[in-house]
Swiss-Prot record:
Keywords: DNA integration, DNA recombination, DNA-binding, Transposable element, Viral genome integration, Virus entry into host cell. This is Transposase from transposon Tn1545. One of its GO terms (molecular function) is DNA binding. Residues 79-163 form the Core-binding (CB) domain. Residues 186-392 form the Tyr recombinase domain. The active site is at 225, 264, 343, 346, 369, 379 (o-(3'-phospho-dna)-tyrosine intermediate). It comes from Streptococcus agalactiae serotype V (strain ATCC BAA-611 / 2603 V/R). PROSITE patterns: CB (PS51900), TYR_RECOMBINASE (PS51898). Gene3D superfamilies: 1.10.150.130, Classic Zinc Finger, Intergrase catalytic core. One of its GO terms (biological process) is symbiont entry into host cell. Coiled coil: none annotated.
Length: 405
């Protein structure tokens, strides 16, 4: 009968266990790929003390028990050791054909993970507390609440892949961010009717911004996304039927420059009606066009709104213009205008029609929303005045019904 192996304390070692000359314990096993793997610890059992100068650690027998539980539960003991960066890369590789801005967003998050200590951690070692600490670090580094929430959602999706692949049991990013950080997201600006009138009147009369009056008016009266607006070309306008055809958007990237994208969803492809004010504004835009050299971008030309270099304007151009316009207005007027962006004008358009009682499905179509919930959120932007007006309208209709009856 062969003699049992013992450690330097005379304790019998089990199958696969051994002790190195430096006193460290080792456990050898064969993984699912038939490759030998090793687990180490300075302690055989939990009650052991680590040698002087060595960091405390989990005992070998505890590690073996955890390993055997993983194997019993079907956990991939090799896969669970991949880093968070590797897991995120794996998720992205499963969906390689994405839009340019999605690709850019992925790159930003990967760069963040590579610089953060969480990125090199094995996924099996990441706990909910680690994920929450990551969110706090992101906030301390100046990232906005919504940006952190978007990145957290991506990492949560990555861990669902790891769970499906039996690499881990739980998702450390499955928590509410608002329980960790205060939501400092600034509410989207909705212009009141009075603010809308003052903005348009000031732009129309101002020597610098009068050239932008029709652009602002069209945005307020069509609710277009700024990328859709910037991508408008002459063939997109149907004056006979008073429609604006939307089937593409114009974007600009710091690396590749201008490019055309199709709408993110099929709902983005639509025909937006021209109300009279928008119709007349488009007519003025065409009448004021100069016969300059026209650029072509991905097969599209005859863009309606050009900058001084005859390139089509994009979101950054309009953000800068609106910022300057509001700043100038507020300099000369006591009744200040709020911070306004091109999206504020789209938000105002949708809210106005929601408060006017437009059928939600009709408004969803005009806005190009993929989900009706997005549209219904605008119906929640009612003010006390609009709520009171709506109650009066409904009461008046009821009274008229009674009189008819």
């Amino acid at each position: 009968m062969s003699e049992k192996r013992r450690d330097n304390k005379g304790r019998i070692l089990k199958t696969g266990e051994s002790q190195r000359k430096d006193g460290r314990y080792l456990y050898k096993y064969i993984d699912s790929f038939g490759e030998p793997q090793f687990v180490y610890s300075w302690k055989l059992v939990a009650t052991d003390r680590v040698p002087a100068g060595k960091r405390d650690c989990i005992s070998l027998r505890e590690k073996i028990a955890e390993l055997q539980k993983d194997i019993h539960d079907g956990i991939d003991v090799v896969g669970k050791k991949m880093t968070l960066c590797q897991l995120y890369a794996k998720q992205n590789a499963q969906r390689p054909k994405v839009r340019k801005n999605t690709e850019t967003g992925r790159k930003y998050l990967m760069d963040i993970l590579k610089k953060d200590k969480l990125g090199v951690r094995s996924i099996d070692s990441i706990k909910p507390s680690d994920a929450k600490e990551w969110a706090i670090r992101m906030s301390e580094n100046g990232y906005a609440y919504q940006t952190i929430n978007n990145y957290k959602r991506s990492l949560k999706a990555s861990f669902y892949i790891a769970i499906q692949d039996d690499c881990v049991r739980k998702n450390p990013f499955d928590f509410q961010l608002k329980a960790v950080l205060d939501d400092d997201t600034v509410p989207k600006t909705v212009l009141t009717e009075e603010q809308e009138e003052k903005l348009l009147a000031f732009a129309k009369a101002d020597k610098t911004y009068s050239k932008n009056y029709d652009e602002i008016l069209i945005l307020l009266k069509t609710g277009l996304r700024i990328s859709e607006f910037g991508g408008l070309t002459l063939p997109d306008l149907d004056f006979e039927n008073r429609l604006v055809n939307i089937d593409h958007q114009l974007l600009r990237d710091t690396e590749i420059g201008y490019y055309i994208e199709t709408p993110k969803t099929k709902s983005g492809e639509r025909q937006v009606p021209m109300v009279e004010e928008a119709y007349q504004a488009f007519k003025r835009v065409l009448a004021n066009r100069k016969n300059d050299k026209r650029v072509e971008i991905d097969g599209y030309s005859d863009f309606l709104f050009l900058n001084r270099k005859n390139y089509p304007k994009v979101a950054s151009d309009y953000n800068g213009m609106m910022k300057g316009l509001v700043k100038k207005y507020n300099k000369y007027n006591e009744d200040k205008l709020p911070h306004i962006t091109p999206h504020s004008l789209r938000h105002t358009f949708c809210t106005n029609y929601a408060n006017a009682g437009m059928n939600p499905k009709a408004l969803q179509y005009i806005m190009g929303h993929a989900n009706i919930a997005m549209t219904l959120n605008y119906y929640a932007h009612a003010t006390f005045d609009s709520a009171m007006a709506e109650m009066k309208r409904l009461n008046k209709e009821k009274q008229q019904e009674r009189l008819v009856a």
